[in-house]
Amino acid sequence: MQENLVIVESPAKAKTIEKFLGKDFIVKSSFGHIRDLAKKDLGINIGEGYKPVYEIPGDKKKVVDELTKLAKSKTVWLASDEDREGEAIAWHLTEVLGLPVDRTKRIVFHEITKRAILEAIEKPRTVNMDLVNAQQARRILDRLVGFELSPVLWKKVRPALSAGRVQSVAVRLIVEREREIIAFRSAAYFRVVAQFYAAGDPEKTLFKAELSSRFETEAQAETFLQSCIGATFTVAKAEEKPAQRYPAPPFTTSTLQQEAGRKLGMSVSQTMSVAQHLYEQGLITYMRTDSVNLSQQALAQCKEEITKLYGEKYSRWFNYKTKTKGAQEAHEAIRPSYIERQEIEGTPAEKKLYDLIWKRTVASQMVCAELDRTTITIDMSGSSNQFVAQGEVVRFDGFLRLYSESTDDDQAAESGEGLLPKLTAGDRVLPSQITATERFTSAPARYNEASLVKRLEELGIGRPSTYAPTITTIINRGYVVKQNRDGQKRNYAQLTLTGEKIASKTLSENYGKEKNRLSPTDIGMVVNDYLEEQFGPIIDYNFTASVEKEFDRIAEGDITWDKMIDEFYGPFHKMVDSAITTQTAKTREVRILGNDPKTGHIVKARIGRYGPMVEIEGNEGEKGRFASLKKGQLIESITLEEALELFALPRDLGQLDGEELMVGIGKYGPYVRYGKSFASLAKTDDPYTIGYDRAVEIVRAHQAAAAAANTPLKSFPEDADMLVKNGRYGPYIAYKGKNYRLSKGAKPEELTLDDCLKIVAGSKK
C-alpha cells in the first residue's frame, strides 16, 4: 500500500504530477466535482437555513468507490486547483471519503513544476472553509435564481426557456448594444486632408496634415477648397516631445481571452480549453486568475532571458498592481512555467497560445519604447481653420521588439505620419493636393467574445472562472448568436484640389462587415425585456456586481454565506410570486410593418411556434401566408421591404428531367425539391439567390448518394433476403423487411452469412 494518496481534478494533471513524486505517492484524479446539488427538485432546504442537498452523480460513483478504497492510505493530500472551485472540490472529497476536514492535508501551487509541487508538500494547510462557503453561496444562489425564474418564463413567455443570474446580465448588455445600433442614424461629413511640402525643399518631400474642422455638406467642402486657391499656408507652431510607450502587464484570465481572440481568432471557451491543457502539462501557471503579479523567481528568469536575447539595456523590472474590481486569491499572472522555454511541442493551437503567453510575459519586463512625437500646426490666410500634422518616430524599440498589444477596434486606428520635416514657426508650406472625402459616423460595434468579457470585467460582474461558461450558456440557450455579416456597398464623394482645379468623383466602398460578433435573437430580446420589467433589480449591473462583492466578503470570512443568501432570497422570492400572479401578457408582441402592395393586407412580424416570422394576413376566414426570418434579422428592426422578400419562397427554378425544380425553406431548413424528392442546401447556399445550375448539382449529388445507399455492400447467393447496406448512420444489415445495426468497428466487407444470421438472432433476444 502506498504511503500517500494525492487527489487532483484531471487525469492529465495527475500524470504530470506523478512524474515529480516518488514511489511512496500515488496520484489519482477525481475528474472534477464528485458531487453536486441534487438534480431532482430544488436541491436546497430553504427552511433549514438554505442547507444544500448534495448527491453523487451516477457517472462518478465508480471514481468515488476507487478513491474511497485508496483513501485508506496513511496520508491523503488534496491537490485541487487554488481557487474557490478547487477548494470546494477538496471539501467535497473530505465529506464523501470521510476525511477529517481539520486534519486532511491541502496543498496548492500556481504551476505544475517539480519545485512547486515539492514546496507545496513541505507547506500543507487545511481546507479553507471561507473559500468553500463562497463557492457554495454562488452555487446555491444561482440554483435558486434559475429554479424559480425558469417556470415564470415558461408561463409568461414560452415553454422550455431558462434564466440565470450572470447570464441574463450578459444578454442584457448584448440587447442594449443591438438597440443602440438599431436606433443609430449615420450622418455624413467631409474630412479634409492636405499633402504639403516645405517651401524651398528641392525634393518636395510630402507630409500629410488634416484640417481640424469638418464639413456637413459637399457644398461646404467645395467652398472651403475654393478658398484654398491662392491662400498662403504658414507654420503656426511646431512641437517635438519625447514620449514613452509602456509594455502591457502579464496576462490575467480576461486579458488572455481578449488578446487570444484578437490575435489568434480563438473563442473564449477555446482559449480556456487550450490553456487548461498547457497548465496540466506543466507548461504555464494556473489559467484562472485576476492577478498581474509575477513571482520573484519569474522576474529573475525574465531578466536573464531578456539579457541573453536582446542585451541588458532591454531589461527593466516592472511590478504591476491588480486593478480588477474585487480581485480574488493571490495567484500569479498567467506565465510560462519555464521562462527559458520559448517553444513547446503540441497542437498548433497550443503552440500559438503558448507563444502569445511567453511573449507577453517577457515583454512585460522589458524597457519602455522611446518615441519622438511631433505636432505641426499650419495656419491658412483668410481663414480661422488650421491644418495639423502629427508624426511619431520610434527612437528605441524597447519591448516593441518582441510584442505589441492589440486593440478591440477591427479597423486599425490611423496613426500619424512617421518622420516630419524640420519646420519652425513662420515657415511657409505649399499644398501639393488637398482632398475632401465624404465619411460617415459609425454605429457602436457589436460585442465579440473578447470585448464582452472586457465589459463584464469593467462592471465587476463575474470572475475568471465564469466568463467562458457564461458566454457558452447564452449561445447554447439560443438567446445570442455569434455570426458574420457581409459588408454593404455604399458610394461616397471625393473632391480634390490640385493647383487651381477642383475635381469631383464618386467612389464606392464596403462597410459594416463583421466577424464573430454577438447579436441577440428575438427570443433573447423578449426574455430580456420581460426580466427587466419584472426582475429589474436582479439583472441590474450594479446589483450583480454587488453580489460578487458579497461572495468576496464570504471568502474573506467577513460574513456568513447563509445570511448573504437570506438577504437576497427574501426580496427575490417576492418578485417571483408577484410575476406569477400578475396578468402580464405573454410578451408575444406583434409588430405591424405595413401593407402588402399586391393585396393590401397587413404585414406583421412576431414570434411563432417555430421562431420569429413574418405574416401577410389572409382574407377573412382564410389563413395568412407565413415566412421565417433569415439568420441575423430581428422582429424589432426588419423593414417591410425585407419582410416581403421572404415571401419569394418557394422559388420555381424550372424543369429537371420533366419534374419541377423548386427551392424553399422547410421545418428542417433550406431545400431543393424535384418531383417528390427533397435535398438539403449546403450552409453556404442562399435559397433566395441560388441558381438553376447549383440546384441541379445538389440534386445530382443527392441522387448519387441515394443510389449508393440502395446498392448493397454485400449480398449472399445462398440467402437473397440477407443484404449488408450503407445507410445514413453507417453500415447495417437488411433482412426480411427489418434493419439491424452493426457493432462499432465491424467490417461489413468481411461479414459472412453466418455472422449476419448471428447478429439478426442476437437482436431478437
Report each predicted region and the residues it spans.
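Short glycine-centered, acidic/aromatic-flanked micro-motifs in structured strand/loop junctions
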Residues: 80-82, 258-260, 288
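Accessory interaction regions appended to the cores of large information-processing enzymes
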Residues: 22, 29, 38, 151, ...
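Basic, low-complexity terminal or inter-domain segments flanking catalytic cores
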Residues: 2-5, 16, 23, 71-74, ...
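Metal- or metallocofactor-binding catalytic centers and their adjacent structured scaffolds
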Residues: 216-250, 257, 424-428, 435-437
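C-terminal or mid-to-C-terminal helical accessory/interaction module adjacent to the motor/catalytic core
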Residues: 112-194, 240-244
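A conserved hydrophobic secondary-structure block that centers on an alpha-helix together
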Residues: 257-259, 263-270
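Intrinsically disordered, low-complexity regulatory segments
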Residues: 1-140, 148, 153, 318, ...
